[in-house]
Amino acid sequence: MAKIKKGDLVQVITGAKQERGGDRGKQGKVLRVFPDTNRVLVEGINRVTKHSKVGQSQRGTKTGGIEVVEAPIHVSNVALVDPSTKKPTRVGFRLDTVEKDGATKTVRIRVSKATGKDI
């Protein structure tokens, strides 16, 4: 089970300060998780400029130009934001047994290390 999932609110904890044009301290929602490369795509964070070649689409409209998109950032550079305190926190797990259809299953529940509450 991943500590950071799609839809979580995270805060950038490393990198250049905001005064210098960086993203440290900014918060954003996780748009996508790349588990094979340990990276996450965060809304409004690590924006890069992409230049694409000018061409024509099938409908005859012009394509290409300069666009600004988000690039993935490494998981170690972000921290999950605790929903109750709105501050970055570490994530732990708590094992809980759930009974469903007569069978008991053990599930892992994400817990904030700072407050001890479920996330």
UniProtKB/Swiss-Prot annotation:
<comment type="function">
    <text>One of two assembly initiator proteins, it binds directly to the 5'-end of the 23S rRNA, where it nucleates assembly of the 50S subunit.</text>
</comment>
<dbReference type="GO" id="GO:0006412">
    <property type="term" value="P:translation"/>
</dbReference>
<keyword id="KW-0689">Ribosomal protein</keyword>
<dbReference type="InterPro" id="IPR008991">
    <property type="entry name" value="Translation_prot_SH3-like_sf"/>
</dbReference>
<dbReference type="GO" id="GO:1990904">
    <property type="term" value="C:ribonucleoprotein complex"/>
</dbReference>
<dbReference type="GO" id="GO:0005840">
    <property type="term" value="C:ribosome"/>
</dbReference>
<keyword id="KW-0699">rRNA-binding</keyword>
<comment type="function">
    <text>One of the proteins that surrounds the polypeptide exit tunnel on the outside of the subunit.</text>
</comment>
<protein>
    <recommendedName>
        <fullName>Large ribosomal subunit protein uL24</fullName>
    </recommendedName>
</protein>
<keyword id="KW-0694">RNA-binding</keyword>
<dbReference type="InterPro" id="IPR003256">
    <property type="entry name" value="Ribosomal_uL24"/>
</dbReference>
<keyword id="KW-0687">Ribonucleoprotein</keyword>
<dbReference type="InterPro" id="IPR014722">
    <property type="entry name" value="Rib_uL2_dom2"/>
</dbReference>
<dbReference type="GO" id="GO:0003735">
    <property type="term" value="F:structural constituent of ribosome"/>
</dbReference>
<comment type="subunit">
    <text>Part of the 50S ribosomal subunit.</text>
</comment>
<dbReference type="Pfam" id="PF17136">
    <property type="entry name" value="ribosomal_L24"/>
</dbReference>
<dbReference type="InterPro" id="IPR041988">
    <property type="entry name" value="Ribosomal_uL24_KOW"/>
</dbReference>
<dbReference type="GO" id="GO:0019843">
    <property type="term" value="F:rRNA binding"/>
</dbReference>
<dbReference type="InterPro" id="IPR005824">
    <property type="entry name" value="KOW"/>
</dbReference>
<comment type="similarity">
    <text>Belongs to the universal ribosomal protein uL24 family.</text>
</comment>
<dbReference type="Pfam" id="PF00467">
    <property type="entry name" value="KOW"/>
</dbReference>
